[in-house]
Structure formats: C-alpha cells, structure tokens
Amino acid sequence: MPEPAKAALLPEDCETTEDLFLYGLHVEQYRHATYHPEDYYLEGLRRDPTDIRLNNVYGRCLLKKCDFAGAEKYFRKAVEKSIRSNPNPYDYEPYYNLGLSLKYQGKEKEAYDVFYKAIWGGSFQAPGFYELACLDAKTGRFAEALEHVNESILRQ
C-alpha cells in the first residue's frame, strides 16, 4: 500500500530554494485550498532573487493573472541569469514566457525576436514557431506564417 500523502511544509519552514520551488509546483498543480504557490515562490525569491526557476514560475503566476508587465520583469530576470555564462541556455522556457508577456502587452516586435530565441530550445520549438506564425499572420506576412506554422506542426 502506498504511503499517505504528506502535507507541504510552510514556506518559512523549507530549508532550500529547491524545496520552495518544488512545494510551490505541487501546491500549484493540486490547487491546495489553503496553501498558495506564490507564497513559496516569493519566499524563494526573497532568499535568492536571481533563481531562474523561481523567477520563471512566479512570472508564470503573474502571467495567469494578466499582470503582463509584472510577469515580464521576472521572466527578464530568469533570462538574464540563464545567459550569464552562455548565450544558449539550458532551458528556453523563460524566453518563451517572456515572449508571451511581451505579446500580451502589445510589444509584438520585441516578442517576435524573443520567440525566435525560444525556438532554439527543443521543447519550445513547436509553441515558439506557432507564436511566430500568429504574429506573421497578424502583420500580413502570410508566406512566413505558413512556413512557421508548418515548422510548429513538424515539431509536435
């Protein structure tokens, strides 16, 4: 018989930023009635304001609440640190999320450039190419839109 589930520690009782990140994801995934993932992410960011994972997931929380400018700040922090030592980061999710936050603010030219960077990462190629196709179509570049949507489909 499996072990019964254990309650998440309170944010202030977590020892590491990794614990805060993982408990926050758990609370977010299972929509706990009394715990809030933001509390875990913010405690982690209080301890380490440069943590890529925490900046990205907290930005995602703000994105879901339509605080696009607020989300942009956290995604930028995640991107900045992820390319501190290498122009090609391990994970391109912060780039993709930054692109979304820019697009939703009407900063479509900048979003386009950021989505182009996001397609360098394997897991964000399909959604990144899709977003490029949408922006191409919106500006009447239909040949490019078709090319990008086909690339998106190929990478599904």
Spans of model-derived segments:
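Start-of-helix register in tetratricopeptide repeats
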Residues: 18-19, 53, 93, 127
